[in-house]
């Protein structure tokens, strides 16, 4: 089992090729990591990680889910919480709960450094590019 420092350094490393996928949003291709790839990286770097949903609420037309990601390392355990949301009447892939949970899970992992560069708009101009044929 790695120390906390070693685990955090490993999670901040560049993402393996093929782990980043793109989805269309607002005329741009937005990079993201699917939740199962996040779980795969956590399994590799910190196999004793733990995820729990701490609350599910509705707010107007949205379902808001809060989850807690805990990393258990050789010298400590540390948790980060994050939220995810989805329209209650979503017409995208999945359902509101699983979509919101996937978002919360990815965001909690990003708080540990995993894929954080995808959230840095200044560092991703080559990644977030306009969709072909759209303005």
Model-derived regions, located:
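Positively charged, aromatic-enriched nucleic acid-contacting surfaces
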Residues: 2, 33-133
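N-terminal, Lys/Arg- and Ser/Thr-rich interaction peptides
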Residues: 1-29
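Long, charged low-complexity interaction segments
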Residues: 10, 134-135
